[in-house]
Amino acid sequence: YVHDNSSRGIGGGMYVDGHNSNRRANIINSRIENNVSLSESGGGLYLGSYVNVVGCNIANNKSISYGGGIYASSNNNIINCNIVKNTSAFGDGIYGNPTVTNCIIWGNDDSQIYSTSSTSSVTYSAVQGGYVGTGNINLSALNTGEGIHPKFTNPTEGVGPDYSGGDWTIQDGSAAINKGKTEG
């Protein structure tokens, strides 16, 4: 659980850089919440190259510049994660060019994903406002009610590190249930 941290540089919660494609860094089943990058990028996570982020909850983080939830350089994989209620100047949820699969990207301050390349790959993910890619779902800005919504158990009311205590598990009836890609 990485929470309530701040950095005067990059990576408010964590700054991670893998070595190469044969020695990837892994962040697995972690909560990265309520962190702040005060002058640079990556409020929750700053990912250099060759990092896998799997099964994580990245919520209520803030960056002054790029990537409120995640700033991703190159050759990064984000799989089975919730990226929710983050804020920044550019790319409130994700900024960069990662490969994103089976994620819920919702409720971030303005832009859910700010891609820095035309080769960005987002697939089998539920994204507020939609995102072009195979198997993606266009989520409503509302958590419940009319439209296609994520139906989180208890989301925070606001975005950024001033809000905490959300329960980001999805309930029965969520538009995201059984919509991801199964491996194997």
Question: Which residue ranges define each predicted feature?
Answer:
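Predominantly extracellular beta-rich ligand-binding scaffolds that present long acidic/polar faces
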Residues: 1-173, 177
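Extracellular calcium-associated, cysteine-rich motifs in secreted modular proteins
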Residues: 181-184
